[in-house]
Design a protein with these regions (language model features):
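Nucleic-acid-processing active sites and adjacent nucleic-acid-binding tracks
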Residues: 107-153
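C-terminal nuclease/phosphodiesterase catalytic domains that cleave nucleic-acid phosphodiester bonds
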Residues: 49, 53-58, 97-101, 107, ...
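Signature of the SF2 helicase/ATPase Hel1-core->accessory helical subdomain module
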Residues: 1-11
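Gly/Thr-rich phosphate-binding beta-strand-loop-beta motif of the actin/hexokinase/Hsp70
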Residues: 79-111, 228
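Short, glycine/acidic-enriched loop or turn micro-motifs at the edges of active sites
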Residues: 93-95, 123, 157
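Flexible loop/turn segments at secondary-structure boundaries
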Residues: 9-10, 62-63, 96-98, 115-116, ...
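ATPase catalytic-site recognition across NTP-hydrolyzing enzymes
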Residues: 16-93
């Protein structure tokens, strides 16, 4: 049983036959013993890694599991698109928006030859109409940024419906049928990451959650951002991949 000091999402804790307790995001496990102020002070004094291991029951190796954070290079200012660059918008969509379900995640890359910049990440639980709206917003935001563009959507569940709906609106997404399991797909992309080919921003509103999921993988509870990332990197590093041929308007 996983009972973090501060609930990281809405959960239902089974207490026995026909008994359960609902914990909401941010609920404290023992507020009488450890208040939010006390826990914040502990986190500040211990550091987030040790606090996560001791109080949140989510130990993350300092360097990471499958992927080390030290492999990534960082950038302060987003790269200015150049001729030949490609924007890759990669979606891993959930089957449901239930508070206990997986997230839908979108990872946006700027690919410049063998150098990759992660420029945006979106992660949310969305009903299908809101999911489609989010896909269209990301598409409209990024499709004209670089000379080449690809929209990737995993061909499963709500992703299949999205691909069909977008096609009817004249938007041609690349339907990705993944091979192998999640670990194999991400492991196949670790070599270029370790070689320093992938860059992340120094600061971004999505960076902390992205880093946490990345370093916890493959033992993290959620891996939607990982799936979207590995899918995007597979295209970015595919041998002889022509830029801008697929995933159009």
């Amino acid at each position: 049983m996983n009972l973090p000091a501060i609930a990281e999402e809405d959960t239902i804790v089974r207490l026995g036959q026909n008994r359960s307790h609902r914990r909401l995001l941010g609920d404290l496990l023992h507020p009488e013993r450890e208040s939010q102020v006390a826990l914040d002070e502990l986190k500040a004094s211990m550091g987030s890694m040790e606090f996560a291991a001791q109080y949140q029951q989510t130990p993350v190796p300092i360097g990471g599991n499958l992927i080390k954070w030290s492999w990534f290079k960082s950038y302060d200012t987003p790269p200015t698109p150049q001729s030949g660059d490609e924007i890759i918008v990669s979606w891993d969509t959930a089957l449901s928006s239930s508070q206990l379900a997986d997230y839908s995640a979108c990872v946006v890359l700027l690919a410049r030859g063998e150098t990759i910049y992660i420029v945006d990440v979106l992660r949310a639980r969305l009903e299908y109409p809101d999911l489609k709206r989010a896909v269209l917003e990301q598409h409209n935001r990024w499709r004209d940024v670089a000379s080449n563009y690809a929209l990737l959507i995993e061909k499963k569940g709500s992703g299949l419906s999205l691909i069909q709906d977008l096609y009817r609106e004249g938007i041609y997404a690349i339907a990705v049928d993944p091979n192998g399991d999640k670990i194999m797909r991400m492991a196949a992309q670790t070599a270029p990451i370790e070689a320093g080919a992938v860059h992340v921003p120094t600061h971004a509103p999505w960076l902390d959650e992205f880093k946490k999921e990345l370093l916890s993988f493959p033992f993290s509870k959620h891996d939607d951002q990982i799936d979207a990332l590995s899918q995007a990197l597979q295209r970015a590093f595919a041998p002889g991949m022509p830029r801008g041929i697929l995933g159009g308007y």
